[in-house]
Amino acid sequence: MHLAYPAVLAALLFCVGLYGVLARRNAILVLMSVELMLNAVNLNLVAFDVWLRDTLHSGQALTLFTIAIAAAEIGIGLAIVLAVYRNRGTSAIDRLRDTAETDAAETLPDDAGTGPSGTDAAPNGDTTTATGRPGDNAGKNKKAEATR
């Protein structure tokens, strides 16, 4: 068997998967592209195992191990995407980069004065200490905002 055929096919599969990871914005499509890249690696492992005529067939054994890891990865990845979709209402990667911590920091005005005992008061009533840790009532206000 010529090694060039599966190697070229694996390179094409890997490039298509890499393009999908870099160009797609949907988290599920990114996971599918990662799986495509893993399948390209598996094809290379089997092709080189056959080409080298390894008596232990370590390439094929490693391929089985990689398939098991990929199955676990896609299961956990889809569970995370589903949980994020339920909480945020979207699975677009660009919209998921903003976390709640950066949103809270952006709501503070620049001229917010320092309150008593080294705390900063936010417009919504949340207080943070001088070290940046939330005060006692920060959790209560976040729950009230979530119910609105």
Curated annotation (Swiss-Prot):
It catalyses: a quinone + NADH + 5 H(+)(in) = a quinol + NAD(+) + 4 H(+)(out). It is found in: Cell membrane. Keywords: Cell membrane, Membrane, NAD, Quinone, Translocase, Transmembrane, Transmembrane helix, Transport. GO terms for molecular function: NADH:ubiquinone reductase (non-electrogenic) activity; quinone binding. InterPro entries: NADH_UbQ_OxRdtase_chain4L/K (IPR001133), NUOK/Mnh_C1-like (IPR039428). The chain crosses the membrane at residues 3-23, 28-48, 64-84. GO terms for cellular component: NADH dehydrogenase complex; plasma membrane. It is an enzyme of class 7 (translocase). Residues 96-148 are annotated as: Disordered. Gene3D superfamilies: 1.10.287.3510. It is a multi-pass membrane protein. Its EC number is 7.1.1.-. NDH-1 is composed of 14 different subunits. Subunits NuoA, H, J, K, L, M, N constitute the membrane sector of the complex. NDH-1 shuttles electrons from NADH, via FMN and iron-sulfur (Fe-S) centers, to quinones in the respiratory chain. The immediate electron acceptor for the enzyme in this species is believed to be a menaquinone. Couples the redox reaction to proton translocation (for every two electrons transferred, four hydrogen ions are translocated across the cytoplasmic membrane), and thus conserves the redox energy in a proton gradient. Belongs to the complex I subunit 4L family. This is NADH-quinone oxidoreductase subunit K 2. It comes from Streptomyces griseus subsp. griseus (strain JCM 4626 / CBS 651.72 / NBRC 13350 / KCC S-0626 / ISP 5235).
